[in-house]
Amino acid sequence: MARSIWKGPFVDGYLIKKVQKLMESGKSEMIKTWSRRSTILPIFVGFTFSVHNGNKFIPVSVNEEMVGRKLGEFAPTRTFYGHGADKKVKRK
């Protein structure tokens, strides 16, 4: 079920403050965050976020196509190593 429109998108307050500070200073630093639940806003475009995946921080460069999605969608938490190979290898 989607979030109610009257509430608006959820973004942690400190993320907006950090982005605004970087916009004022003109620097382009990586913003380190644990907030995977925050929605990507249009003011985030062009910035790089380090999103925590439970083990390490994954760099996520934000572009226009990502607006409206969550930061956590771009930092996978699980690694797939593939299914086990068949032990009965048939050779002819």
UniProtKB/Swiss-Prot annotation:
Keywords: Ribonucleoprotein, Ribosomal protein, RNA-binding, rRNA-binding. It comes from the Bacteria. GO terms for cellular component: cytoplasm; small ribosomal subunit. Gene3D superfamilies: 30s Ribosomal Protein S19, Chain A (3.30.860.10). One of its GO terms (molecular function) is rRNA binding. Belongs to the universal ribosomal protein uS19 family. Protein S19 forms a complex with S13 that binds strongly to the 16S ribosomal RNA. This is Small ribosomal subunit protein uS19. It comes from Rickettsia canadensis (strain McKiel).
